[in-house]
Amino acid sequence: VDAQGKPLTPGLFAGISHIGLEEISQEDSSVDANLNLKTGDTGLIETLRPEFDVTRAYNPRSTLLAVARVGGMSFTALGTDGALLSGQGGVIRLDGGYEPIAGKRVPFISIGAGKLGQSGSSRAAQFMLLEQAFNEAKAPTPGDERLLTGQGRNALNQAMASQRFLVSVNREADIRQVLKLAQKYAIRVALVGALACLA
């Protein structure tokens, strides 16, 4: 970059955030980061919605963008964490544009205690449901009970083809299971949180 003698300030990454997806976190009508379907809305397991694309609700006119830019932040990864397989996010420049960088989406998986209510109160069930979803997306069996919608299968197939997933996980035993899952399905995972790795 030739700045012709002018000072340059590097932009910082704001991490995985809800900037532009929520204004006031305690005001439900201003929070678009998570899909909160009520049980029975569709008859499908509500914790597995890989087709939910949180970038579609991104508001580049949010007042929080200006605050982030003043703090030196120039881009962020929009994330969703409302469910076990909670949907997709993407990296966004905080420059007022609407589209994720390169148009790419990254799926989010959330494992652990915070999702026990959505998975029969068992971490083992979380991994069971994820494996069933991956298998169903690869080769759905006619007449088999469906965990995913048709769009969900397509979204998960595309995600598996791109091989990138962000996984929110903290407990060491859960991290080990995530790595086994990644190896089994030949996907790459980036761990979010991973608090057990800090010990």
Language-model segments: what does each one mean?
Residues 60-189:
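Polyanionic/metal-chelating signatures
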Residues 23, 186, 199:
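Feature captures the catalytic cores and cofactor-binding loops of soluble hydro-lyases/lyases
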Residues 190-194:
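Short internal beta-strands
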Residues 56-60, 196:
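Short, glycine/acidic-rich beta->alpha junctions
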Residues 170, 195-196:
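Short beta->alpha linker loops
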Residues 176, 196-199:
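Catalytic core of soluble alpha/beta enzymes
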